[in-house]
A protein has these predicted regions:
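Predominantly soluble domains enriched in secretory-pathway, periplasmic, or organellar proteins
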Residues: 5, 13-322
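Bacterial N-terminal signal peptides that target proteins for export
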Residues: 1-8
Length: 322
């Protein structure tokens, strides 16, 4: 495992002794085995740090003092000090961790183990495995309700969302979704669960209390074959009125009215757009474009791309730090 800064990171760190007021966007580069750091104000890459093999999922602790990274091919979750770029230690994650979600208690990490059809729960303080929960085949998407009572794992091959009681670590419901569910998030103060289906080309909206489907969002981009319109990551604005949805190899982001579930617009971005993160002030949206190896910056108010930023090879996940 490479825990030393690259020469690039060392040089760039000299330029970043003072914290950026507008915050940072941290991007995992799946084929470079690095994370890139973008200044959310200047829109420039200011650092790059080495990680384990094939970094994908990425998230911060509540106080932003720790960065968690799924190093999938290293079979571990790495914990980084974002102030130095140093890998502090590894967490026991199970095999091939792809995505995870941090519980609202800021302590328990729920990890999707793609190869083992398991969700692993790890205590980030004691560094112990609390539970391993059997779910469907190829788990990936992870979510947890705002009150912390329910965790979700989506399984790509089983085509289900699995509802987990976080007290007992037991699955209490399974709901069918369209083909190859990739990403899940609780929205509307936890009242709804949204699940994207990459091959199905949809987002399913569930009533979180009853687990019943209440709406389905479909996408149709003029001039692009439906097979290329593959929803993956998505984010809602803080007022939860507008959703932005990454549509994979269609190279577009959809803008959706989150109240009517109608698609309002499609924005052209880089190639194979996968995940996204808002800037800390929520004025910009940063999308990871795997095949083109860059990040597109979208002006949220204007709903238009304003810049493309080159990062590492196959950028995958993104997370913001103020």
């Amino acid at each position: 495992m490479r825990h030393l800064l690259t020469a690039t990171a060392t040089a760039l760190l000299a330029l970043t002794s003072a914290p950026a007021l507008a915050g940072e966007i941290w991007v995992t580069n799946e084929k470079s085995d690095t994370v890139s750091v973008i200044d959310a104000d200047t829109l420039e890459v200011i650092a790059e740090y080495p990680t384990g093999e094939r970094p994908r999922g990425i998230t911060f602790s509540k106080d932003f003092s720790r960065l968690y990274i799924c190093a999938s091919d290293s079979d571990t979750v790495q914990v980084m000090d974002p102030n130095s770029g140093e890998i502090l230690y590894d967490l026991p994650s199970g095999e091939d961790p792809e995505q995870f979600v941090l519980h609202p208690n800021d302590r328990h990490l729920y990890i999707a183990n793609e190869d083992d059809a398991i969700t692993t729960v790890v205590d980030t303080e004691t560094r112990e495995v609390l539970a391993q929960i059997r779910v469907g085949i190829e788990p990936e998407g992870m979510a947890v309700s705002p009150d912390g009572a329910v965790a979700i794992t989506t399984s790509e091959t089983t085509n289900m969302a699995h509802w987990i009681d976080t007290t007992t670590y037991e699955v209490f419901a399974n709901t069918l979704v369209d083909a190859r569910p990739r990403h899940a998030e609780f929205v509307k103060q936890g009242g709804e669960l949204w699940v994207s289906a990459e091959i199905g080309g949809t987002i399913s909206v569930f009533d979180a209390a009853t687990q019943a489907e209440k709406a389905k969002i479909s996408f149709d981009i003029q001039g692009i074959h439906p097979d290329k319109v593959q929803p993956v990551g998505f984010k809602l604005t803080p007022d939860e009125k507008t959703a932005f949805v990454a549509l994979g190899p269609s190279n577009h982001v959809a803008v959706v009215d989150a109240e009517t579930y109608e698609v309002l617009d499609y924005l052209l971005v880089g190639r194979r757009v996968w995940h996204m993160a808002f800037s800390p002030d929520n004025t910009k949206l940063f999308t990871t474009n795997g095949v083109s190896g860059d990040v597109t910056v979208i002006d949220v108010a204007e709903r238009k791309p304003v810049k493309t930023i080159k990062v590492g090879r196959f950028p995958w996940g993104a997370a913001a730090r103020p």
